[in-house]
Amino acid sequence: SSAASDVYKRQAENGTRSIRFSVTDQRGYQRIVDWQIVASDIAVQTVAIPDDKKYLIWATKATLFGEVLPEREPQSELSFRYRKVGTTEWQTVPAVRNGSVLTAEVTGLKNSDNELFSEYEYQVMEGAMASNVKCQFTTEKTLQLENCGFEEWSGSKPMYIAASSSDFFWDSGNHGSSSVSAFATDLTTADSSVKVEGKYSAKLQSKKIVIKFAAGNLFIGKYLDTQKMNGILGWGRSFTSRPVALTGYIRYTSGTVDNGGKYIENGEQDKGQVFIALGDWEGQTYGGETWPLIVDTRDAATFFDPKGDNVIAYGEQTWDSSTEGENMHPFVIRLNYSLERIPTSIVVVASASKYGDYFEGSTGSSMWLDNLKLVYDESELEE
């Protein structure tokens, strides 16, 4: 037979093949080499989203990756196709080329039915031909805040913003205002007369407790201790998703400041504030408990700094005067993400007197909050 008939030409199916060569010499020494061989009819290949770029996967958008294969040059238009895992219909988006790296941002991603996330798969395309490599990613969860409609309450002096005093997500200064038994009072309470839906809203009322001014407040976390009528607070809870806004409903009554000082003077109108922050704080410990942040109202150096190194996103809204009428009004606090990191914790704080940390404000100020919601899809804010 001819020499040619001894040579077999193998036509590999498109894909990545692993070949392992193992060679052992006469002395028993062994060497193993692994090769990755890419069989492809096109000049591009899909690439998984790199570990150091996981921050490019959000709840409703993600950046897809591909590459131009070495010593190959695409001859047709480059794009990506993507779909939810388990569905049949692909969507297509143009690829952006930077050297050999291909990317595309896809938006409008939706959760799977009855899930807080979804799984997507994608392939890079050259013309009408898809790369043989298919990659997947899972979107961030569209988590919501617990008891965000403030329907669950228990106890009195202190009143808890939860069904049980042993398991709560929110807390308030009620522990401090109830610590002097003869003058015990709750600053933050359930109110059935002002609400958007359900049974209650949260009412935050600023008051004078004995000789000290106390702002009506609530926050994600736990009131840890009272030291000489000063509160020590653990702020924040674990949270790894990235909403684009906090929305809710508010009614605010701004009193005339009667406990003025350095930050707001007597006779001025008091200010109410709600703020939200996401960060990767290392954690601080008090009394054996570790919290993302610990605020000691005796020490201004412990107060929250929105420009702190570990703040990944921050948004706030201040009300300089009373809201109109007796109804609640919608508000939107957008979040600006400044860092290419994924948070570990979330902080939300509301105060009927913005400068309550400094014991300044008005005993005539009250704030009602209801139906807080974390928004993940920008298009919801445009409606």
Please describe what each predicted stretch is.
Residues S1, V68-G86, D270, P343:
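Solvent-exposed loop/turn segments flanking beta-strands in beta-repeat/beta-sandwich domains
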Residues A3-Y8:
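Short, small-residue-biased leader/transition segments that mark boundaries at the very start
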Residues R10-T16, V106-S118:
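Surface-exposed, short loops/turns at beta-strand junctions within beta-sandwich domains
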Residues G15-I19, L116-Y122, T344-I346:
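Exposed beta-strand face motif in extracellular beta-rich ectodomains
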Residues T24-Y29, G127-M129:
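Short, solvent-exposed loop/turn segments at the edges of extracellular beta-sandwich modules
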Residues I42-V44, K134-S179, E383:
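Extracellular carbohydrate-recognition regions
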Residues S192-K212:
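Short carbohydrate-recognition loop motifs
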Residues E282-E382:
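Terminal, low-complexity interaction segments
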